[in-house]
Amino acid sequence: MNNPVLKPLVIKIGGAILEKESALNALLNVISQLKNKQVVLVHGGGCVVDEMLAQAGFTTEKKHGLRVTPKEQVGLISGALAGTVNKAIVGTANSMDLAAVGLSLNDGDMISCTLSTQDLGQVGVPQTNNSKLLDCLLKAKFLPVISSIGALDNGDLVNVNADDAAVAICQLLNAELLLLTDVNGVKDADGEYLSSLNAEQAQKLIEQGVIAGGMTAKVNAALHAAQQLRRSIAVASWQSPEQITQLLDGHGVGTQIQPN
């Protein structure tokens, strides 16, 4: 796995792509054409979670773009992400002959979690643990589809921010990472898309309120990954799945988050 030519590609999806069947199909079609590339999909699904919580009479609270997960909502959120969303993606992928396998972060002891100290309730901080399951699946040419549900050492389920989950899987496999979002990248104060962004620039834009909400969490996760892996991380739009092949060909796509 450490041969750069053979580095797997971790793609994080979420947001509106999960509500737009044609967009998911287009992404999976591009993945199906990457014949010699090992790919792992990591997904969130906040839109589906919000809908299911509302149907159950719960409200949704977020802090700094991160979901607050009260203990009484964990079962419902886990069912939405590891169940409904995960199996829908797997079903679509398998209909396209992609041999998808649905997983959560704690399957095969891949990722261990500790409870977040940010007063977010049952939210986990992911840490790499054991790559054996993913190694076996990728070697056998399966497409792992991983939900952002993990578990603490005592077995309690926790919700993990999907960007953080993707970063952890990326670190576990020493992989390339592409964070797909609803927009073409990160914007500057003038509303123009940035081709690259480092920690100092990001902090300034966050303080100015230019980077806000869910994009704050995404940029912070990408910066963390860039620092840990010592290479740039791409934040790009799911609306242009052809960018994946451009990225693999060495071209810059979206906003490249740079290590210091």
UniProtKB/Swiss-Prot annotation:
Gene Ontology biological-process entries: arginine biosynthetic process via ornithine; L-arginine biosynthetic process
Keyword Ligase applies: no
Compartment(s) where it occurs, according to its Swiss-Prot or TrEMBL record: Cytoplasm
Record InterPro entries: AceGlu_kinase-like_sf (IPR036393), AcgluKinase_fam (IPR004662), ArgB (IPR037528), Asp/Glu/Uridylate_kinase (IPR001048)
Positions of the record's site feature: Transition state stabilizer: K12, K218
Chief location category: cytoplasm
Residues the record lists as binding substrate: G45, G46, R67, N159
EC number(s) on file: 2.7.2.8
Keyword Secreted appears in the UniProt entry: no
One GO cellular component, as annotated: cytoplasm
One Pfam family recorded for the sequence: AA_kinase
Keywords, comma-separated and alphabetical: Amino-acid biosynthesis, Arginine biosynthesis, ATP-binding, Cytoplasm, Kinase, Nucleotide-binding, Transferase
Pathway: Amino-acid biosynthesis; L-arginine biosynthesis; N(2)-acetyl-L-ornithine from L-glutamate: step 2/4
Reaction(s) the record says it catalyses: N-acetyl-L-glutamate + ATP = N-acetyl-L-glutamyl 5-phosphate + ADP
Molecular functions (GO terms): acetylglutamate kinase activity; ATP binding
Functional note: Catalyzes the ATP-dependent phosphorylation of N-acetyl-L-glutamate.
Stated family: Belongs to the acetylglutamate kinase family. ArgB subfamily.
HAMAP family reported in the protein's UniProt record: ArgB
Protein name, per record: Acetylglutamate kinase
Native source species: Colwellia psychrerythraea (strain 34H / ATCC BAA-681) (Vibrio psychroerythus)
Gene field: argB
